Amino acid sequence: MAADTPVEYIKHHLTNLTYGKLPEGYERADGSVVQEATWTFARTGQEATDMGFMAIHVDTLGWSIAMGILFLGLFRFVANRVTEGTPSGLQNLIEMTFEFVQGIVRDVFHGKNPLIAPLALTIFVWILLMNILKLIPIDYIPSIAHALGLEYFKIVPTTDPNATFGMSIGVFLLILFYSFKVKGVSGFSKELAFNPFNHWIMIPFNLLLEILALIIKPISLALRLFGNMYAGEVVFILIALLPLWIQWTLNVPWAIFHILVIPLQAFIFTVLTVVYLSAAHEDH
C-alpha cells in the first residue's frame, strides 16, 4: 500500500477515489504540468482537494449504486420465489425486515400515504447494506484496487459526507414537497409564521425558528450517520496499524460492537425520516 508512515497510511485510507477537473497550468505530484484544463483522477489527496466542489467520489458513487442494485436484486429474487410452505432462510430474513420497517411506519407515521412504507424500507436496507461494508477488513479491497492502479479506494459510502448529505437532502426535499402538497402554500406558510407563538408580533421570530428547524433536519440526519460511521472507520484503521497479535484482540470486539452499530444507524436514519414526513402530513 502506498503509505510509508502511520500518518500517510491513515490519510491514504480516508481519501476517496476522486475524479475531477484540474486547471490549466496545475503542477501534479509527479512534476508534470497540466497543459489545458482536463478531467482526470486525482493522484494525491491534495489534487482531490484542488479539484473542488464539482469533483466526483467515484468509489462512493459506485458502491452506493452497487448496494442499491443488490437490494433490488435480493428483494426481486425472493419475491419471485415466495413459497407458502416453509420459507427459506433468506425469505425469512426479508420478511422479518419488511415487517420490522412496516411496524416502524405503523407506529410513527400518522398520515395516509402508501409510498412512505416502501420509502422507509428502501432507506433502511440501503443504508444497512452500505454500512455492512465496514465489516470487510480494512486493507482487502483497497489492496486489490491498488494492484489495479487505483491509488485511493474507499468502500463504505456512509463514511463520505457526500453520500449522507445526498440522502438527507433527498429527505428534506420530500419534507418540503409533502408540506406544500398536504397543507397548501397558505397552510404551510401560516405554520411557519404562527408556530410556536400564535401572535402576529412574533412572526419574524417564528419564521427564524421554524426555518432553522427545517434546515437543521437534513444537517443532523447527515452528520449523525456520517459521524458514527466515520469514527468507526478511523478506529479500524488505527487498529490495523498495530502489531498483528494485538490487532486480533482489538479488532474482533470492535467488529462485534459494530454489528450493533451498523443496523442501529440505519434504524435511526429511517425512524427520523418517517417522523419528519409524518409531521409534513399533519394538516393543522
UniProtKB/Swiss-Prot annotation:
The keyword Transferase does not apply. One of its GO terms (molecular function) is proton-transporting ATP synthase activity, rotational mechanism. GO terms for cellular component: plasma membrane; proton-transporting ATP synthase complex. It is a multi-pass membrane protein. One of its GO terms (biological process) is proton motive force-driven plasma membrane ATP synthesis. It is found in: Cell inner membrane. It holds the Pfam family ATP-synt_A. InterPro entries: ATP_syn_F0_a_bact/chloroplast, ATP_synth_F0_asu, ATP_synth_F0_asu_AS, F0_ATP_A_sf. The keyword Transferase does not apply. Keywords: ATP synthesis, Cell inner membrane, Cell membrane, CF(0), Hydrogen ion transport, Ion transport, Membrane, Transmembrane, Transmembrane helix, Transport. F-type ATPases have 2 components, CF(1) - the catalytic core - and CF(0) - the membrane proton channel. CF(1) has five subunits: alpha(3), beta(3), gamma(1), delta(1), epsilon(1). CF(0) has three main subunits: a(1), b(2) and c(9-12). The alpha and beta chains form an alternating ring which encloses part of the gamma chain. CF(1) is attached to CF(0) by a central stalk formed by the gamma and epsilon chains, while a peripheral stalk is formed by the delta and b chains. Belongs to the ATPase A chain family. This is ATP synthase subunit a. It comes from Marinobacter nauticus (strain ATCC 700491 / DSM 11845 / VT8) (Marinobacter aquaeolei).
